[in-house]
Amino acid sequence: MATRGHVQDPNDRRLRPIYDYLDNGNNKMAIQQADKLLKKHKDLHCAKVLKAIGLQRTGKQEEAFTLAQEVAALEPTDDNSLQALTILYREMHRPELVTKLYEAAVKKVPNSEEYHSHLFMAYARVGEYKKMQQAGMALYKIVPKNPYYFWSVMSLIMQSISAQDENLSKTMFLPLAERMVEKMVKEDKIEAEAEVELYYMILERLGKYQEALDVIRGKLGEKLTSEIQSRENKCMAMYKKLSRWPECNALSRRLLLKNSDDWQFYLTYFDSVFRLIEEAWSPPAEGEHSLEGEVHYSAEKAVKFIEDRITEESKSSRHLRGPHLAKLELIRRLRSQGCNDEYKLGDPEELMFQYFKKFGDKPCCFTDLKVFVDLLPATQCTKFINQLLGVVPLSTPTEDKLALPADIRALQQHLCVVQLTRLLGLYHTMDKNQKLSVVRELMLRYQHGLEFGKTCLKTELQFSDYYCLLAVHALIDVWRETGDETTVWQALTLLEEGLTHSPSNAQFKLLLVRIYCMLGAFEPVVDLYSSLDAKHIQHDTIGYLLTRYAESLGQYAAASQSCNFALRFFHSNQKDTSEYIIQAYKYGAFEKIPEFIAFRNRLNNSLHFAQVRTERMLLDLLLEANISTSLAESIKSMNLRPEEDDIPWEDLRDNRDLNVFFSWDPKDRDVSEEHKKLSLEEETLWLRIRSLTLRLISGLPSLNHPVEPKNSEKTAENGVSSRIDILRLLLQQLEATLETGKRFIEKDIQYPFLGPVPTRMGGFFNSGCSQCQISSFYLVNDIYELDTSGLEDTMEIQERIENSFKSLLDQLKDVFSKCKGDLLEVKDGNLKTHPTLLENLVFFVETISVILWVSSYCESVLRPYKLNLQKKKKKKKETSIIMPPVFTSFQDYVTGLQTLISNVVDHIKGLETHLIALKLEELILEDTSLSPEERKFSKTVQGKVQSSYLHSLLEMGELLKKRLETTKKLKI
């Protein structure tokens, strides 16, 4: 609640205790206080609304809504009631009701600036742009203030952005907005910078670039003062749109003379120079070269200009990186034109060496040079690195001591050389022993570097952290190339050790998350991810690192929590962006409004959002359906309908940050655009499989309802096909998607370790669960046919069903065979993990659940038939009525399921016993090469993996026991 100031109105004084209780989260007391007040003052509407807020917050939504609607029906106009109702409706996620509230208030108090303003903002929350335009003008008529007028103009622009028909946007909304602003310009009523920005935005969207340029260069442009070079940047954008390269060149040259370290203007300068060369442009015989002054239209002039900037920089007391990097950029561009030798700019290797001498002690030196290493010939890389090492001030090496830096500057220089060594691929050409030798050296340098960071705060990174990261990357290379798991355990040990010295190092945490997950250990990952303290959009961009493994490693409670965490962000996005839009209107930041809308759409259409939503629903069904509630109840509570697909397939946005890991890999080993494209294809395919599976499951309970007669022409309401037709269509789609998925998996795509994470699709096919699940859905179709056709003359269908029962059991046994083996074993004194077995077990548990839901449907169809036959038998006292074998087959199948699930439960118990019996400490003690510190962290790492496996087995075992109980209830 908003805190109220000094209060005159006695009603405000009476309401004060309720506000206080609500502010402090004491909702029950707020309800009691409101009830007391309402006994004395029945007409105090605000007390009723505050009571409703208390009820809403204690989970009594329906009661709260009824109370709120009682007050809303009275169309209140007092500020307290309106504000309280606004808060309540927001908490109910019903912003559309706020608009009705203020529409009524405005009718009763037509000249209230405040209520008109609230009405406008209420429309903004629900995106009613047409009504916003009208509300803005109504407000301007009551109080002729410029901001209100321009609210209306902006609402027209929003109508143009949201219009489906682009032609309508260009011919109606934007021209009307332009005329409205021109009216203000003619009347000389433009007051604020925001109004000029809006005029510019309209002209730009209409493609009137020359008019927009005239506005910026004219008197109105003088109002653009809040951002540095705002006017120049807008002029530059228009020159580019108009392909006026002479002006682009002259303006960027002029801006570089002012600030020769502004990189964006170097790029524009080079772009324009080479465009002018391409067009063979020459200046006019008389007068200025261009509107913006002198133009450089040849490579010679560009070379001289850059050389002059470097000369000027050398005289300055402040070292600038821009001119030196611009020289390298110019060499690259001249080379691409095939004319480098003509202009003797120098050897890139020597230029980079000189750059390193000047800026090597700055952390940015590596990222600056990274862009230009492709200018180096491959044969010169080793020579270049040795040349750099030659100027790094290190101590004299001895037999047992490395050459070490004496201060932080020297450490930073050496670190830059090591990073460049990896980037140039020199580490990748080494064999296993050479790489392990490099790891030892890097870790010694890391330990030495910690001396310089003794005074660092916990929130600061150690100066030598990159040595540790580079060592881990080298160990991962060895692991990936040789399959030697010793190196991955060592990598985990180094990262855990690094984290104790740099608790805030996000790269350490991200790598730990990735490696633990790849080893199948989800337990340590939850806290690690949480400690990253991901903010806002990061839940979408890096959330995939957690949610990809959430369900697949058998820790259902943690998986559920992780999905909830991600979903909370996406659900609040809608509300949050509405507030940003309102603030943008209030403060006249009009150019930000389309950005906020685009941002909201990007999140609503997020691939990660769709994945988490689907997985969360499947997880909820797995944990609840037919355990705490029936499948039908679970599906109803989730509002699931098989005919509805709420995933925006055509507009899905991949917002994942696939470059979140620092990478020093050469270009041919790094994450490429092709990797990203393939990963998106794989993710979309897997999402489609999961979504179709969910929709098929959600259609099962609806088949239990009275069925339509055979050959019935009747269809369901609103022309929707009958329920079984929907399921058949979904089944066809699932089968087609599975075929596409199989073809994709056959490509055997290997992503870089630091790139996209493969989906669970490969495991789904390899475990045999895909075939199992699709077979069970085909069984549904056969059982439905039997249900509609009856037992007579359906021998063929019954035979199919009997075969399906046998086949399903065989397929499940096959899946179980792929789950056998120890998750953690000691081989030749080394620890070996088998995370695939864990993933297969998780798929088995999920598949068993799907099959039990299908079996439950089979039971609901077969039981009435059997009962009818038994009744007939009793009535006629005949023994000649033969029970069809389908009943016996079902009972045998259920018995088989029970036996199989019992066997899997026993197998899981066996795995637990084996894990507990493993003496990992003895293994660590046997390794004499480890220091006491390394032993400590090795013990931590191995203990975490062991504990996580046990946790996963425990949760899966518990869930399977519940499924076993469900199986025992399947009787006909």
Curated annotation (Swiss-Prot):
Pfam families: NatB_MDM20 (PF09797). GO terms for cellular component: cytoplasm; cytosol; Golgi apparatus; NatB complex. GO terms for molecular function: acetyltransferase activator activity. It is found in: Cytoplasm. It comes from the Eukaryota. InterPro entries: NAA25_NatB_aux_su, TPR-like_helical_dom_sf. GO terms for biological process: cytoskeleton organization. TPR repeats lie at residues 11-44, 45-78, 79-112, 114-146. PROSITE patterns: TPR_REGION. Keywords: Cytoplasm, Repeat, TPR repeat. PANTHER family: N-ALPHA-ACETYLTRANSFERASE 25, NATB AUXILIARY SUBUNIT, N-TERMINAL ACETYLTRANSFERASE-RELATED. Component of the N-terminal acetyltransferase B (NatB) complex which is composed of NAA20 and NAA25. Non-catalytic subunit of the NatB complex which catalyzes acetylation of the N-terminal methionine residues of peptides beginning with Met-Asp, Met-Glu, Met-Asn and Met-Gln. May play a role in normal cell-cycle progression. Belongs to the MDM20/NAA25 family. This is N-alpha-acetyltransferase 25, NatB auxiliary subunit. The lineage of its organism: Eukaryota, Metazoa, Chordata, Craniata, Vertebrata.
